């Protein structure tokens, strides 16, 4: 029988990053040093964010201890700066599973990535000035994931984290004049699609609840 054009095959991809925004999560360690965690497992519901972070990452440890973070949302031109810090960790010594992936310790990811730190209004961790959207947040809940049957025994697992957004900062260039709305014609988030970086294309339509 000829293919209909909508037939599907069963595959087992190594990752399910089908297309989510990249975020740079800034936190403070116990000495007050700032860390940047690049990640892409984040989604929003009203004024809440839900994140998935590695259970052995420095950023996760900082957030669980300090209860505060800034979720900075970059645009596509920042992808090269993000990749400069991608294979680094604030943890020392470097966890075994990250050593196996070629990670190295980096105490100052701001300098390595060429990022500018700027003070937050309501939380201690700094914002990243280059990111067009910067969300100050406080921790509400955290839950460790349940291992699956196929999970590697050496995999550190991940933590599901719920955050409350307490302040939103935006570059004026992406805000509609005289409003509180982000101009979707000017704002293009950096997307992570099966470990590749993309921006958004032209608008295809609008949801019935859109206010602009």
Regions found by a protein language model. Name each.
Residues 1-212:
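Basic, polyanion-binding surface patches
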């Amino acid at each position: 029988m000829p293919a209909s054009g909508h037939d599907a095959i069963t595959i087992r991809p190594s990752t399910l990053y089908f297309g989510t925004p990249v975020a740079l999560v800034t936190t403070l360690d116990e000495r007050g040093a700032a860390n940047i965690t690049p990640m892409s497992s984040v989604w929003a519901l009203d004024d809440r964010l839900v994140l998935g972070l590695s259970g052995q990452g420095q950023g996760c440890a900082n957030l669980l201890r300090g209860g505060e973070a800034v979720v900075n949302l970059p645009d596509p031109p920042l992808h090269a700066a993000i990749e400069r810090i991608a294979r680094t960790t604030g943890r020392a010594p470097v966890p075994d599973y990250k050593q196996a992936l070629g990670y190295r310790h980096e105490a100052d990811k701001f300098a390595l990535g060429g990022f500018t730190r700027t003070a937050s209004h309501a939380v201690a961790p700094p914002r990243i000035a280059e990111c067009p959207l910067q969300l100050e947040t406080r921790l509400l809940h955290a839950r460790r994931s349940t291992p699956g049957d196929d999970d590697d025994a050496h995999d550190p697992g991940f933590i599901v984290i719920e955050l409350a957004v307490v302040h939103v900062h935006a570059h004026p260039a992406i805000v509609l004049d005289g409003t509180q709305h982000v101009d979707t014609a000017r704002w293009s988030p950096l997307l992570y699609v099966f470990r590749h970086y993309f921006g958004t294309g032209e608008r295809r339509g609008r949801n019935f609840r859109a206010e602009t």
